[in-house]
Amino acid sequence: MGCTVSAEDKAAAERSKMIDKNLREDGEKAAREVKLLLLGAGESGKSTIVKQMKIIHEDGYSEEECRQYRAVVYSNTIQSIMAIVKAMGNLQIDFDDPSRADDARQLFALSCTAEEQGVLPEDLSCVIRRLWADNGVQACFGRSREYQLNDSAAYYLNDLERIAQSDYIPTQQDVLRTRVKTTGIVETHFTFKDLHFKMFDVGGQRSERKKWIHCFEGVTAIIFCVALSAYDLVLAEDEEMNRMHESMKLFDSICNNKWFTDTSIILFLNKKDLFEEKITHSPLTICFPEYTGANKYEEAASYIQSKFEDLNKRKDTKEIYTHFTCATDTKNVQFVFDAVTDVIIKNNLKDCGLF
């Protein structure tokens, strides 16, 4: 009888050991699966971060993939110069050379067909080049905070000669700079440091936000993107609303949401390069009238960081991991994402009882 009990006990012990082993393996597998949600207001750089993940973790864009972005580069370039020329009328800025008015008419006559066909014909590129060289156009570009303009406008317009070549193939940097409004949800998968990442990029404009909700379940971490350089801009969809204020409002609702009590929140204060250039001539008081510090990068950026971090109502239990980023700079994003991954690994192991 004793032998039978002993055999049963042994079998039960083996089963228990196997269950423990399976639970541990499941725990380790769960710890290796990372679901990242990219959130933030429109034009904060979320899609650029996704493109960087492809460049850093998936061997980048092939020549054929780059070629497919050519029409987007052309469209962004045409849309940018058109936005500047249209704004000249509203801001009552004249062309320095009166003959540029003919070029402006040509621009509007040729642009529609060019965009539809995804091309940049030589006559149109010459028109754009002459317009961009005009002092009146440059004066209007200098006042771009007063109207809606792509961040990549100067990048493409300054490089028009290269872009207009008949054999032009966009570079990785050209692809990073392209702007296409994200509608719906874009999912990206990659592996890094033995972790399997699923990254979800969702549209930031107000009309897109209702599509976020079903992505929330089982999220490991949220990367919330803020355009630092948007402190003196208004929304494309609501010209009464300051973009930074909108971003803060959105961050408040995400950071303090009951869904995300146990979710790591990583704050990317993005477009630091544009902010550093802009802060010298556009004061932070435009956005924060109470600000009394210097209009210098370090002090102003630190102030914005504290404004966002102060929105966290659970400081005793919830930490915000803040990074200053330039989403178009691959080395910077690589460095920051490395640090972010270490935080995720540590928190994941803790949650699975393995740390």
UniProtKB/Swiss-Prot annotation:
Domain G-alpha stretches: 32-355
Region annotation (G1 motif) ranges: 35-48
Record region (G3 motif): 197-206
Transmembrane segments: none
G4 motif as annotated region, ranges: 266-273
A GO MF label: metal ion binding
Cell membrane is among the record's keywords: yes
The keyword Cell division is assigned to this record: yes
Topology in membrane: Lipid-anchor
Subunit structure: G proteins are composed of 3 units; alpha, beta and gamma. The alpha chain contains the guanine nucleotide binding site. In this context, interacts with GNB2. Interacts with UNC5B. Interacts with GPSM1. Interacts with RGS12 and RGS14. Interacts (inactive GDP-bound form) with NUCB1 (via GBA motif); the interaction leads to activation of GNAI3. Interacts (inactive GDP-bound form) with CCDC88C/DAPLE (via GBA motif). Interacts (inactive GDP-bound form) with CCDC8A/GIV (via GBA motif). Interacts with CXCR1 and CXCR2.
Similarity-based family: Belongs to the G-alpha family. G(i/o/t/z) subfamily.
Function: Guanine nucleotide-binding proteins (G proteins) are involved as modulators or transducers in various transmembrane signaling systems. The G(i) proteins are involved in hormonal regulation of adenylate cyclase: they inhibit the cyclase in response to beta-adrenergic stimuli. May play a role in cell division.
Record-given protein name: Guanine nucleotide-binding protein G(i) subunit alpha-2
